[in-house]
Design a protein with these regions (language model features):
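Short alpha-helical segments and helix-capping/turn motifs at coil-helix boundaries
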Residues: 21-22, 44-49, 120-129, 203-208, ...
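Short, structured active-site-proximal loop/turn typified by the sulfatase FGly-forming signature C/S-X-P-X-R
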Residues: 24-78, 137
């Protein structure tokens, strides 16, 4: 049976860590004309809530599945995998990535997050739409799982670097998948320097324009992650520059369709964020809090001796009891310790 025509194609654009106040300022200063045009022709909702913890892997999985971490099983930026008896680190910082192993961290982020960690009991938006024969497309987004097999890119100029980092295996993703030069289902001529910050939004804009020009999707997840990296460097009140870069990526897509009016004749657009940010004025050192406990180290020479695994993740942290025979006592002691730490608002 032929697939019934869709009324409009949908573009879901996600600007990582976008602050509404900064979006308003970027528009006011004339730095975001594409976003302004979309806002003026649509509905602008400023008071949205993110998931908890509000970090990118958890929020990305929530957006892709419609579920919270208890159901989609991506619990944090850093967590302890009981089945494999090790830490999982998705790249919370360069220092953390080095501590837990660069190759391991990259492999967990690119492969395991989708193929092993993300719950199989909950379908992603790509799987739902693939099942309905709706053409899906995805740029560099953490959660890309779908039904289409993609082998690593053979055309990328970064192929040898990718192979050296163990990116040699296929994945299953959206029908059209473009992930940081590692996977590209079409020869678009677009590159992102292996997903380097500052290049990813431009890559998304380039790929998006190609997909629109060639009519290759019904649903496109248009990922714009560079605002997050810029915010960490310049502060959350310095987003105007990175919002302008995200706007240019959107403008490329609109331009290739003949302008905003022509684009909106055939496309519906949702622009959103996964979470936002605030300035960090104080920090909590969990290593000091648990100085008297035997905490599992990233490359622990004697892991069986560890009592606790401690997993900080910027806005929250998780503590795991590793000694099954003393789990109850260890959890109670950890909760008491954390309740006395200045800066810890909630222990659950």
């Amino acid at each position: 049976m032929a697939r019934p025509p869709l009324r409009k194609k949908l573009v879901l654009a996600v600007i990582d860590s976008l602050k509404p106040d900064m979006l308003d300022l970027a528009i006011e200063e004339g730095r975001a004309p594409a976003l302004e045009a979309l806002r003026d022709r649509g509905t602008y909702v400023r008071d949205c809530l993110s998931t908890f913890p509000s970090v990118t892997p958890v929020a990305s999985a929530a957006i892709a599945t419609g579920c919270g971490p208890g159901e989609h099983h991506i619990p944090s930026m850093n967590w302890y995998h009981r089945g494999e008896e090790r830490y999982v680190e998705y790249g919370s910082s360069f220092q953390a990535t080095r501590a837990f192993g660069v190759v391991r961290s990259l492999y967990d982020t690119v492969y395991n997050m989708n193929m092993a960690h993300l719950s199989r009991a909950r379908r992603t938006v790509f799987e739902h739409l693939d099942d309905a024969d709706v053409r899906t497309a995805c740029t560099t987004w953490l959660i890309y799982r779908g039904h289409t097999r993609h082998d690593p890119s053979g055309a990328s100029v970064y192929r040898r670097i990718a192979e050296a980092a163990q990116f040699r295996h296929p994945v299953y993703g959206a029908r059209e998948l473009f992930y940081a030069d590692l996977f590209d289902s079409q020869d678009t001529g677009c590159t992102s320097a292996l997903g380097m910050p500052g290049q990813r939004d431009r890559h998304t804009g380039c790929v998006g324009a190609y997909l629109v020009e060639h009519g290759l999707f019904d649903f496109l997840l248009f990922s714009l992650p560079d605002n997050d990296t810029h915010s960490h460097r310049a502060g959350p009140d310095g987003q105007v520059v990175s919002i302008a870069e995200a706007d240019r990526a959107l403008e490329r897509v609109v331009h290739v369709a003949g302008g905003v009016e022509s684009f909106l004749e055939d496309h519906t657009v949702i622009v959103m964020s996964d979470h936002s940010q605030t300035d960090v004025t104080d920090s909590v050192n969990l290593a000091e809090a648990f100085a008297e406990a035997r905490v599992l180290a990233p490359s622990d020479p004697a892991p069986v001796e560890a009592e606790l695994a401690v997993c900080p993740a910027a806005r929250s942290a998780m503590v795991y009891a590793l000694d099954e025979g003393r789990a109850g006592a260890l959890v109670d002691a950890a909760a008491d310790t954390l309740a006395e730490v200045e800066g810890v608002d909630l222990v659950a």
